[in-house]
Amino acid sequence: TSKISTTYEEEGRQSKIQPRAFVITRSGPTSRSSSYSARQSYGSRSSITPGVYQQLSSSGITDFRGTREKEKREMQNLNERLAGYIEKVHFLDAQVKKLEAENXXXXXXXXXXXXXXXXXXXXXXXXXXXXXXXXXXXXXXXXXXXXXXXXXXXXXXXXXXXXXXXXXXXXXXXXXXXXXXXXXXXXXXXXXXXXXXXXXXXXXXXXXXXXXXXXXXXXXXXXXXXXXXXXXXXXXXXXXXXXXXXXXXXXXXXXXXXXXXXXXXXMDYAEFWKSELSKCVRDIQSAYDEKIDIIXXXXXXXXXXXXXXXXXXXXXXXMQLQHVQEEVKKLRTQAGEKNAAYAEXXXXXXXXXXXXXXXXXXXXXXXXXXXXXXXXXXXXXXXXXXXXXXXXXXXXXXXXXXXXMELEIACYRKLLEGEESRVGLRSLVEQAIGVQGRGTASLKDTIQQSTASGSMTVQRSSKGPIAFNSVDQSGSNIVIENTTSGARAKTQSLKGWRVDKTVAGRVAASIELKNYDLPPNTKYTIWAKGAKDRATADNEQIADMFSLGVG
């Protein structure tokens, strides 16, 4: 049978329910088992019965069936360690992937930078710009790189025209991507600088200005930068028509900014636009002065030539005089036209300035109104708070009164239930309390009896280490204790624990325990407010309730 039991343990756990197939026979006293024959079918192990084994193991003697259990435990440990390793491997794998992605991004950026640095030839720079534009469609960071590339191209200044074209393309790309508004503004500024350097492509500069205006329409935040760029373009351009276009663009920008004035308040708008408009006006005036000077110089030269010719021949002089007079007329009409245009522009500027001032005044008025409304709201809130405080005081008074009223209500209810027999107040009170006067001396005794016979349940058991030890009948204190002992003994911090009092399924009061470490098998007392003045030991606490519950 010993061999049978070992094979049983190696095979693992068979079902405990086995058919009784063995034959019970009477055997000789010499035979080993007197109850039944030793020829047991199946390996019903005769080593130890399950009940005995259970008792032994619960009393701490375990190693009867030891080898198998040890194997099981070792397998469990190995499995846990394997799971830990697998988790680590997953984590490292994720980190490696992240680092690889970062490396790739860094390499791409480095490659782009290297390409920009290496491209000395104009064609190579143009190709790099095209590549950057393609990247810009892909990502915003690439757009920043494109801006850097444009700056590099401007610095190289190998082919100014090509650089301008590339800048225009970059500006278009920036316009396409609304996300990189700031980048677009920077690109526009770069484009303006490039246009100034080129100075040949005035039309390109105008286009850039238009693009800047569009960008301003797209993002009002960059409007100031756009206006500055427009002013720079106006200064750079010598052509009067271009200047007029720039002025129109500036006016449009001013209108847009005036519309956006209410949105954000960073600086006094009226002053800012006044200074900006005066700048523009000054530029225009200087341009017109130059034009008039040139015209006058040309007229003087023509007159000198006419005088020299007149000295040569009188008839020819008469003819030339007529010509000169015609020329002077033409020039005068031109000057008149120019002056009229300038006056118009000045009038428009004045009107825009007036509009800006009006908008600023309106904004100030709105702000004042908002402040007044806020003050009124604050006053209303204060009044409401005072009312709420008064209501809270009234509620407290009502709650105090309610307790006194409940007994009276019970008595009146008894009266109303229609007992015809005239009943004394005392028996009424006894009925309400639920006590028949068992020869008690006075009403006070009955009430005390009823409080003693009332019921209050306390949660004695607890899942955690802390349980109730005792609860005072008169409601003056509650004692809790740390019940851990033996191997599970540990100190428990009371921080964050509460003692709740529930009445009819609703939490009537909850007491937050103070931050105190309660060692095992130690008590902690919670006193009601009137029962004790102050905590004498540090394992005590005074609650802010007058009674913790009676009964």
UniProtKB/Swiss-Prot annotation:
Gene Ontology MF: a single term: structural constituent of cytoskeleton
Record region (Linker 12): 259-275
Region (Coil 1B): 121-258
N-acetylthreonine carried by residues: 1
Region described as Head: spans on this chain: 1-74
InterPro entries: IF_conserved, IF_rod_dom, Lamin_tail_dom, Lamin_tail_dom_sf
Ranges annotated as biased composition (Low complexity): 25-47
Residues annotated as domain IF rod: 71-423
Linker 1: annotated span: 107-120
Region (Tail): 424-551
LTD domain residues: 454-551
Keywords annotated in UniProt: Acetylation, Coiled coil, Cytoplasm, Intermediate filament
Disulphide linkage map: none
Region listing for Disordered, in residue ranges: 1-54
Start and end residues of each stretch annotated as Coil 2: 276-423
Its job: Epithelial intermediate filament protein.
Oligomer and partners: Can form homomers.
Family annotation (PANTHER family): INTERMEDIATE FILAMENT PROTEIN IFA-1, LAMIN DM0-RELATED
Family recorded in the similarity comment: Belongs to the intermediate filament family.
Protein name: Non-neuronal cytoplasmic intermediate filament protein A
Source organism (scientific name): Helix pomatia (Roman snail)
Source taxonomy: Eukaryota, Metazoa, Spiralia, Lophotrochozoa, Mollusca
